[in-house]
Structures are given as C-alpha cells and as structure tokens.
Curated annotation (Swiss-Prot):
Similarity-based family: Belongs to the jacalin lectin family.
A Pfam family matched in the record: Jacalin
Keyword Membrane attached: yes
Matching SUPFAM superfamilies: Mannose-binding lectins
Protein name (record): Pancreatic adenocarcinoma up-regulated factor
Task of the protein: Plays an important role in pancreatic tumor progression and metastasis. Promotes pancreatic cancer cells migration and invasion through the TLR4/MyD88/NF-kaapaB signaling pathway, without the involvement of the TLR4/TRIF pathway.
UniProt KW keywords: Cell membrane, Cytoplasm, Glycoprotein, Lectin, Membrane, Secreted, Signal
Amino acid sequence: MLLLLTLALLGGPTWAGKMYGPGGGKYFSTTEDYDHEITGLRVSVGLLLVKSVQVKLGDSWDVKLGALGGNTQEVTLQPGEYITKVFVAFQAFLRGMVMYTSKDRYFYFGKLDGQISSAYPSQEGQVLVGIYGQYQLLGIKSIGFEWNYPLEEPTTEPPVNLTYSANSPVGR
C-alpha cells in the first residue's frame, strides 16, 4: 500500500481502475511497454458493437484484445501525437468510441449511442499509455484507460565534460 502511495505521489502511472460499461467476461489488458509509446490503433466493429482493440507500440502491433470478427479501422498517430481524451458509448456492450489527440484530431469508431462517458487523464500532460477491460463472445463489455506522461526524447547533445585547472578555486 505504501508503495502505491509513493508511486502516485511521484507521478507514477494512473491506475485508478475506472472502467466504463456494465462489465462481465474475460479480462484483457495491453502489454506494459516502458520503451515505446502508442503510435497506432486498430478497432474492430461489427453488429453495432466494438468487438476488439489493438494498439501499436512503437513499430510493433500488440495482441488483438477482445472478441473475434468485425470490420477493422486502423489509425496511425503522427510523430509526437498522443491520445489525450476518449468518449465511449455503451448499452449492453461498447457501441462506439471517439479518441481525441494532442494535435486536435479525432477518430470515430462505431456509433456514439447509449450511455456516453468521457475518460481523460487526472494530470495535465498525461496521455493514453494502455487499455484494459472485459469482453464476451459478442464484443467488449467494459473498457478502461491507463494514463501516464509521454516518454522523454533522448537528447542528441553529448554530455558536458567538466575540467578543472590548478588555478581554479574548485580545483584546489
């Protein structure tokens, strides 16, 4: 418990565990990847339901999560673009989603009808880093979103070498 509190205070991942939808079925979660960001998304929709989701982490697609079937829509994020807010619509299953990005773009998957909820990070500057939820044979029953800060870009500048001379006050 103390470890979780410490991580929260240090700006660790937001694991509030909020799930949208009625729930039930098998659990799923995207792979935890601390070296790559979400760079793309595939969502399969069929029979007015969201069947499955799949995220692209860096250059590789993670496993497809959810039920089989449906028509797949694919979105590729631009370099430096992140998902910053999501709207979801439920009846008995997830019916649709709208994902908003840091570059003022948005993507519709399915239809926004039923009970509509919004999901966004609790801290300014956080972005979508993972998706989790539950699914049954027909589609996704509940969905949740993990938020954290984007990865820092590695610096291209070489480290500064400090040298001290015998005449400098620091070198004495």
